[in-house]
Amino acid sequence: MNNGKVRIYELSKELNLENKDILAVCQRLNISVKSHSSTITESEAELIRTTAENLPHSPSLSAAPEKSNSQNQDSGIGYNEQKKQQILEVRKPKPLLEKSQQKNHSKINNNLVTTPPNTSVLNNQVERVGISRPNSSLKSETLKDNSEVGDNSLVQHPNRPLNKDNTVKENYVPQKTDSNEKSKVEVPKLVAPPARPAPPSLNRNLRNTGVNKPNQKNKKPKQEGKKRKDKEEKPFEKPAIVSKKENKDTSIEKPTIASKKENKDTFQNRESVKTSASDTSSQLKPKHREKPTVKLKQEQKPQLAPKPKLTTPLKEESTDVNLGLDLEGKEPEDNVAETVSYDLEKPRRKTIAPSKPTLTKDKKVSKWEEEEEDTSEVIQKNAKSSAKNKRLRLKPLLEDEDEELAELLNKPAPVTMSLSLARPAKPKSFTEKNKPQPGSNISNLKKKSSQSHESVQSESNEQTQSAELKPVEKLVISASMTVQELALALAIPETEIIRRLFMKGIAVNITESLDIPTIEMVVKEEGIPIEVPEEQSAAKKTTEILEETDLASLQRRPPVVTIMGHVDHGKTSLLDSIRATKVAAGEAGGITQHIGAYHVDVEHEGQMQQVVFLDTPGHEAFTAMRARGARVTDVAVLVVAADDGVQPQTIEAISHAKAAEVPLIVAINKIDKEEANPDRVKQELMEHGLVPEEWGGDAIMVPVSAIQKQNLDTLLEMILLVSEVEDLQANPERLAKGTVIEANLDKARGPVATLLVQNGTLKVGDIIVAGSVYGKVRAMIDDRGYRVDKASPSFAVEVLGLRDVPQAGDEFKVFKNEKEASAITTERADAKRESRIMRRTSLGAVSVRAQEGELKELNLILKGDVQGSIEAIVAALRQLPQKEVQLRLLLSGAGEVTETDIDLAAASEAVIIGFNTTMASGARQAADAAGVDVREYNVIYKLLDDIQGAMEGLLDPELIEEPLGQVEVRAVFTINRGAVAGCYVLSGKVVRNCKVRVRRNGEIVYQGILDSLRRMKDDVKEVNAGYECGVSFDNFNNWSEGDIIEAYQMVTKRRKLST
């Protein structure tokens, strides 16, 4: 004590009490203290001494009882919980109950549906076993009543005989209480839980014995008895003490989850079973809808409830447990004895209720077996209460399902099915014919249903398999196919194709593409005929520009003329001559040549008509459109030099024009030269199907001179005459569609595309889609460099506003909204990415980066002297490993390297390979100007080595370790900053800032960078073998004599192709 202050722990020692006892006394006396080390005044200590002397010295002297008492005064919740725990310990009657039940129906009591009790529903659990649950204010009275009644009064004797006359009296004891019994507290009796269904063979024995099977209907009389008990004891209780929660629990009976399934038959038999206790049921009707709760466990092993499955009610003669719980608050009015016990004597009501789909397939039950049990007797009645029937459907429990049911209990409830989806009723004849025998039991039903289900399932699988594996009569091979696509076409497994190719020495996987010869080899083994269609030219027009909706608004449009021909035959000179003669008069500065299409006004029959020329030669657009170039044109002009004759490029142009089915006008140029021989040119053209008109054919041939400007008007007049015959029309009122002539990325204006409108009218602000690119037209510029607001059919304009650069030759179309355009471009981009991944020239595996678009590619253009050399080189290229670099063969053919090949290589960044061939005139200059790599070979091995080296050059170099030398630690010196190793260079050399490893007894103790290297106190860059040096590291000082320092460096090395 100091200055009249006393500490709590000193006072506890003085009084021989614990600190918590003193704190409890302080709390009772309202003395403010915080802990056992708090100080109080001497007067307060004296008061505590006086109070503590009157209290017993025991650990019970604490603040907890006082605190609980005060809490009980405020609310009865805590006291009720303590009371519930004490009552739940009364378990003496249970062995007697179990013994009596096992004596009468030991085989029936194995599959009780229970769920584990929890603390949140202890009130309901007490009610389930018939133990009264008093209020908090009736603790002493309830204990007293329980002691008076005794333990045996809580048990209902199961072997007491049951007859129909006294069933109601026995089961509804609380209803029959006399006036003399009202003075006493009614003690509800413990009711035996319901038993599982029994086989029909036991039904007769159970009827004869008359065993009383209590069910859940006994709860309602007990509940009423509870209410009366509360009324009788109301003068002794305080209304404020009873909590809302307890009142709710005492007034509302909650059925168990299991009863929801087991009471199905009771619900269905409600109309058929009428009892004379209607007034009793009206008294027992609960005020609120009952909520599900949980049964109390028996001491036996609990049998968990199965999850409802897709099933129908049991057969007519099968037994069931009737718990007698009416969710609507009604009681049966006729035969109570049969309702309370097993419903054995009356046949069950035949119902057709919608089945409940289940989330798991633990037990297979045949649909047909279920439908045999369905009848049409009650389908109309159940239509009004379909939801009730769905909830109360009963599923029998099988004895071998104990372990599986535990897993099913915690799963979510199944989704109910609408009654409109249920199958209609079967005819009575069909139902009676398939009626099960009374002697059939659950095991037979399960066995039969399983067999039926397996047979139906196997039959359906066979039908599906036969439908999927239907062989094809003839296979059309148009291009390479993957193994998966070929297997689907042949209706055989993919593994079979992989196995067959593996036996032939070809290793493939399911995603690899097979070339046509390999596909033919596989198909021939199947005995299926093969059809290889002729290769369709890409120049053929596959899409119609005009549609049916355009026929009502067609107008004439200018012709689109494409100039084609061999290199240096005067195509560009002819176009320049036409521009100079017809445009210079109207436009003082001439025509801008920055786009590939332009229009010329031509006078024909006294009227000015417009002709649109497409300047394809020398353009990147023409290179991208080479195979499709003829599709955009209406009239093709073939330029042939009179002094050179027909050349390979001329023949190619003729084939494009025929594939596109466009009229062809031949312009024989350079007739002003001395070496010109137009007749020889006509003769050569006849060999390719072009017969001049003067020789009796239909081919129009006009001799012209671009330099002398001879017969240019005749050529233009012929173009207009041919266009009139073709009757070229379009609908300018519709949304525009056409073709991309060329496209490029401008530094100032962004993506720029030259569009040729073939139908409709293109306007500023339109949403256009070109291939996999879309955008909004911000501005349009015509061939003269002027801005225009709209472009009519056969008009070529430059368009600004696209989000990306489209591919030359792509078709464009205008859409009404941007959302639709974005969806289409996304779909096309995905398809384009997939086609690029699947486009392969070898059988190498597709790497992961190929699927993600990160695969490196090497583009090749192959030209050879003969076709046999080309085939040999292509076969050799397929053998190169292509897991990391994909080899793309863009073009292969026999002949010389032309300027067109140079343009294609420049556009696609390809390498041109020439094998025993030459370069055409002008091709080498074009290659130098475009920066195209042209390789020429005459030995195939050298060619393959160089291609493999080029593929390896695309790979990222790998880092390898290169050793520098070894150093031995011979002395260790300690300095202020740490330790320095005195070393001797054994071999090689050691370099400052190189990577090192320190080994001690063969184990690595440190890895890092050599920070400091000195020789004779001088910093040096390197020390060679045979010299001493000092070595130190910033973060390593644990040196030991004899350590070996390995110095090395990382260098890059060219990677090899992995097989």
UniProtKB/Swiss-Prot annotation:
<keyword id="KW-0396">Initiation factor</keyword>
<feature type="region of interest" description="Disordered">
    <location>
        <begin position="418"/>
        <end position="468"/>
    </location>
</feature>
<feature type="compositionally biased region" description="Basic and acidic residues">
    <location>
        <begin position="291"/>
        <end position="300"/>
    </location>
</feature>
<feature type="binding site">
    <location>
        <begin position="615"/>
        <end position="619"/>
    </location>
    <ligand>
        <name>GTP</name>
    </ligand>
</feature>
<comment type="function">
    <text>One of the essential components for the initiation of protein synthesis. Protects formylmethionyl-tRNA from spontaneous hydrolysis and promotes its binding to the 30S ribosomal subunits. Also involved in the hydrolysis of GTP during the formation of the 70S ribosomal complex.</text>
</comment>
<dbReference type="InterPro" id="IPR023115">
    <property type="entry name" value="TIF_IF2_dom3"/>
</dbReference>
<feature type="region of interest" description="G5">
    <location>
        <begin position="705"/>
        <end position="707"/>
    </location>
</feature>
<feature type="compositionally biased region" description="Polar residues">
    <location>
        <begin position="202"/>
        <end position="211"/>
    </location>
</feature>
<feature type="compositionally biased region" description="Basic and acidic residues">
    <location>
        <begin position="359"/>
        <end position="368"/>
    </location>
</feature>
<dbReference type="InterPro" id="IPR015760">
    <property type="entry name" value="TIF_IF2"/>
</dbReference>
<dbReference type="Pfam" id="PF11987">
    <property type="entry name" value="IF-2"/>
</dbReference>
<dbReference type="InterPro" id="IPR009000">
    <property type="entry name" value="Transl_B-barrel_sf"/>
</dbReference>
<dbReference type="Pfam" id="PF22042">
    <property type="entry name" value="EF-G_D2"/>
</dbReference>
<dbReference type="InterPro" id="IPR006847">
    <property type="entry name" value="IF2_N"/>
</dbReference>
<feature type="region of interest" description="G4">
    <location>
        <begin position="669"/>
        <end position="672"/>
    </location>
</feature>
<feature type="compositionally biased region" description="Basic and acidic residues">
    <location>
        <begin position="259"/>
        <end position="273"/>
    </location>
</feature>
<feature type="region of interest" description="G2">
    <location>
        <begin position="590"/>
        <end position="594"/>
    </location>
</feature>
<feature type="binding site">
    <location>
        <begin position="669"/>
        <end position="672"/>
    </location>
    <ligand>
        <name>GTP</name>
    </ligand>
</feature>
<feature type="binding site">
    <location>
        <begin position="565"/>
        <end position="572"/>
    </location>
    <ligand>
        <name>GTP</name>
    </ligand>
</feature>
<dbReference type="Pfam" id="PF00009">
    <property type="entry name" value="GTP_EFTU"/>
</dbReference>
<keyword id="KW-0963">Cytoplasm</keyword>
<feature type="compositionally biased region" description="Polar residues">
    <location>
        <begin position="55"/>
        <end position="75"/>
    </location>
</feature>
<feature type="compositionally biased region" description="Basic and acidic residues">
    <location>
        <begin position="230"/>
        <end position="252"/>
    </location>
</feature>
<comment type="similarity">
    <text>Belongs to the TRAFAC class translation factor GTPase superfamily. Classic translation factor GTPase family. IF-2 subfamily.</text>
</comment>
<feature type="compositionally biased region" description="Polar residues">
    <location>
        <begin position="107"/>
        <end position="126"/>
    </location>
</feature>
<dbReference type="Pfam" id="PF04760">
    <property type="entry name" value="IF2_N"/>
</dbReference>
<feature type="compositionally biased region" description="Polar residues">
    <location>
        <begin position="274"/>
        <end position="284"/>
    </location>
</feature>
<keyword id="KW-0547">Nucleotide-binding</keyword>
<dbReference type="InterPro" id="IPR005225">
    <property type="entry name" value="Small_GTP-bd"/>
</dbReference>
<dbReference type="InterPro" id="IPR000178">
    <property type="entry name" value="TF_IF2_bacterial-like"/>
</dbReference>
<dbReference type="InterPro" id="IPR000795">
    <property type="entry name" value="T_Tr_GTP-bd_dom"/>
</dbReference>
<dbReference type="GO" id="GO:0003743">
    <property type="term" value="F:translation initiation factor activity"/>
</dbReference>
<feature type="region of interest" description="Disordered">
    <location>
        <begin position="55"/>
        <end position="81"/>
    </location>
</feature>
<feature type="compositionally biased region" description="Low complexity">
    <location>
        <begin position="452"/>
        <end position="463"/>
    </location>
</feature>
<keyword id="KW-0648">Protein biosynthesis</keyword>
<dbReference type="GO" id="GO:0003924">
    <property type="term" value="F:GTPase activity"/>
</dbReference>
<feature type="region of interest" description="Disordered">
    <location>
        <begin position="93"/>
        <end position="394"/>
    </location>
</feature>
<feature type="region of interest" description="G1">
    <location>
        <begin position="565"/>
        <end position="572"/>
    </location>
</feature>
<dbReference type="InterPro" id="IPR044145">
    <property type="entry name" value="IF2_II"/>
</dbReference>
<feature type="domain" description="tr-type G">
    <location>
        <begin position="556"/>
        <end position="733"/>
    </location>
</feature>
<dbReference type="InterPro" id="IPR027417">
    <property type="entry name" value="P-loop_NTPase"/>
</dbReference>
<dbReference type="InterPro" id="IPR053905">
    <property type="entry name" value="EF-G-like_DII"/>
</dbReference>
